[in-house]
C-alpha cells in the first residue's frame, strides 16, 4: 500500500504540473515577423526566441506567455552560464539541454580515481559537455563525447571551444557508444524512469530506463582490458518507488559488470532542501552515486 501511495503522489504531482501548464498555455501573445513582440513596454525577445527556434519567422504566430517567459529565462541562463569551479570556467546551456545546476555529481566525477594509464574515455549522452570537459581537465588526453540531440551537440562543442578543450574532445552524433573501445566510459543518464511531457524534460526522464540499460548492457563490449565504466545516478527513483531497490544490481549482473567501488554524496540544490516541495518526502532522502564498474 505504501508503494502505491508514494507512486500515486508522484503521478499526482506530475498531473498537477501538466494541468497547470495547460491552463497557463491558454494565455498567448502574438509574435510578429522576425520574432518581434509589439506590446507596450514589451522587452526585446528576438535573441531569446532565436535561441529556441533558430531561423526567424516570416509570419506572425501565437505563443503561450508562459512558454515565452520560460524561453526568456533559459536565454538569460544561457548568457550567464553556470560556474563550474573544477573547470575554472562556466558552462553555457541553451533551452532544451540539461544544465549542470546541481553540481554534486560533478564532485563525484572529480573524486573517483582514474583507471591506470587512462588514454581514452567516452562520455555517453554528453549534453552540455560538462563531464567530457572535467575529464579533459583531469588530464585524459583523448575523449569521445556522444549525443543524439543536435542542440546538445552544438552546445557541447561551443562549451569545449570556449574552455580551450576542443582538441582533447571529439564529439560524435551517435546513439550511446562510438565504434571503438576506451579505458573509461562515463554516463549520467536521466534519473527518473518516467515519460517526459515536453522536450525540456527529455534530459530528466528515461522511459523504461532505456538509456540506463543500453549503457550498462553495452559497456563491457566497449571497454579495454582493465577499463572502467562509471555510472552517475541518483536514488530518487527508488524513494519515489519508480524503481525497485534491487533493480540496479540486477542490471549490473545482466550486463556482466562488477561493482569495484561506490562514491556517494547528498544533493544540496534548492529542491532537496525545500520542505514545502511536493516531493520533499523523497528528495530529503535522495543520495547521488557514482558506481565504478568493471567487466567480469
Where are these regions (language model features)?
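Short "lid" loop at the C-terminus of a central beta-strand within the Rossmann-like core
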Residues: 191-192, 209, 234-239
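Conserved beta-strand signature within the Rossmann-like core of class I S-adenosyl-L-methionine
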Residues: 226-233
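N-terminal auxiliary segments of SAM/dcSAM-dependent transferases
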Residues: 1-82
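Conserved SAM/SAH cofactor-binding pocket of Class I
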Residues: 102-189, 193-197
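Class I SAM-dependent transferase core
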Residues: 66-115
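Class I S-adenosyl-L-methionine
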Residues: 249-295
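Short, electropositive alpha-helical surface patch
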Residues: 237-255
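Glycine-rich S-adenosyl-L-methionine
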Residues: 199-224
